[in-house]
Amino acid sequence: MNNDPNLEDVWWVELDLPAGHYEYEYLLINGNRISDPLSRRLTNGKTRIEIGAGGASTADNFSWQSDGYFRPELDTLIIYELHVDDFAAQGNGQGKFEDVIGRLDHLKSAGINAIELLPVTDFPGSHSWGYDPHLMSAVESSYGTPEEFKELVDEAHIRGMAVIMDMVWNHIRSSSP
């Protein structure tokens, strides 16, 4: 790895890799292994990236369909707060982003014009309300992929529904990078 002489704690590496899926983590001087603090996707606790042709990242290839979306006026918001795992579960506690999408029309017909998601950031373990986040830039993989999260937001916007996210910066897990 290379160190930027102008920025004491900034390290970088440049690799010529063929297109594919890659996982990495950082090995610290003290022997601890951590995920990239800016990870958008994790697999087994390791940062996962996808590299496309010519070395380009494929992370931002999502095709948004909700052109022209405008958030409802604040004084007109009718907010439904939900926990993805519990709200979308079919009695098994395994709710996913795609399951929430399947219930958006029901919420819309009830007059809801905004959903507030309890934390959807990565958390340790298999079940949590998200108030012990591990990485703030990665969605919880048991709910779905970053692309499936974007699809949820897009589908809500297509229906004229705002998406509010509960972010928990003051409860971040002590073992997080």
Give, region by region, the residue ranges found by the protein language model.
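The feature marks proteins involved in alpha-glucan
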Residues: 4-81, 86-92, 99
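Substrate-binding/active-site clefts of carbohydrate-active enzymes
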Residues: 44-46, 67-74, 83-177
